[in-house]
């Protein structure tokens, strides 16, 4: 499966099965950072990564994404945030919550920064297959050398909607194998075999489902974006990937208060942007990985609420 999308061979010795992508992230952070050390995190970002750093006693240093004609990563801002305590860069692309895809150039420059400063990279590319309009998400696999210090996180939860199975994997340099195997052994002792068999079936036979899933998400994205754009009050960049719309609504700067009002008064659930760190406040994250008819109803409810 790894060789097919990226067109290059992979060794099984570089892969470690984990209890979901979250355990892969937790193991990766334990490998690299300790108390008092720092990790650079482009934000808005999924908050669980910050939590994993805090468990290790490390500190997340937010580096805000630029918001011009699209969400984008400024490598100069990233490098400016490096200090003697910095140990790693975490990059989630395609990204939750913004749906932004880092360009090949942004990825290559991030890798160059890591090389110059001796940093590790944790590459969370779990939404890499869920892209729209014929776009391919660039990967660190496209630009890395065999000796680069990169840990890749993956999960079955997104592509194949297997969230409840709690299965993912960590791809790492093989010299880390003994340490990673011990961390798995001392925490969960491994992933249940029947879950691994389900994951194998998804990887070997799940392309048709993934194609259907992406097309359904694309239709839902278009319905949501078109419905909210017609209100004239909702501001957003159309997501290039993943299945989230990160938007702001004129007149509502407090995202938590807005999210509570939406669920109470319009019957639409949304995540407040403040939960995703610097750059998130004033936004909402709407998930459109649902049936298009449900998304159309959500857009209608929001439009009626805004009009009222």
Please place each PLM-identified region on the residue numbering.
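PLP-dependent class I/II
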Residues: 1-308
């Amino acid at each position: 499966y790894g060789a097919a999308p990226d067109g290059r061979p992979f060794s099984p010795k570089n892969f470690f099965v984990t209890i979901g992508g979250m355990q892969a992230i937790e193991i990766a952070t334990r490998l690299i950072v300790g108390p008092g050390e720092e990790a650079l995190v482009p934000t808005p970002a999924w908050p669980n990564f910050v939590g994993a750093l805090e468990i290790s006693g490390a500190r997340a240093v937010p580096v805000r994404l630029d918001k011009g004609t699209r969400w984008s990563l400024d490598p100069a801002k990233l490098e400016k945030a490096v200090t003697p305590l910095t140990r790693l860069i975490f990059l989630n692309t395609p990204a939750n919550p913004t749906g932004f895809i880092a360009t090949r150039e942004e990825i290559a420059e991030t890798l160059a920064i890591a090389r110059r400063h001796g940093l590790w990279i944790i590459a969370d590319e779990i939404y890499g297959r869920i892209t729209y309009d014929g776009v391919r998400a660039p990967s660190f696999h496209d630009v890395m050398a065999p000796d680069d210090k990169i840990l890749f996180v993956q999960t079955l939860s997104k592509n194949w909607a297997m969230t409840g199975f709690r299965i993912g994997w960590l791809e790492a340099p093989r010299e880390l194998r003994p340490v990673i195997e011990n961390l798995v052994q001392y925490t969960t002792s491994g992933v249940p075999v029947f879950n691994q068999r389900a994951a194998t079936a998804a990887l070997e036979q799940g392309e048709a489902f993934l194609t259907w899933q992406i097309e359904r998400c694309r239709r839902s994205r278009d319905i949501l974006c078109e419905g909210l754009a017609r209100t004239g009050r909702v501001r957003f960049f159309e997501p290039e990937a993943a299945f989230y719309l990160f938007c702001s609504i004129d007149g509502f700067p407090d995202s938590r208060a807005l999210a509570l009002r939406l669920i109470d008064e319009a019957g639409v659930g949304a995540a407040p942007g403040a939960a995703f760190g610097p750059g998130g406040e004033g936004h909402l994250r709407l998930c459109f990985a649902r049936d298009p008819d449900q998304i159309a109803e959500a857009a209608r409810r929001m439009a009626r609420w805004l009009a009222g």
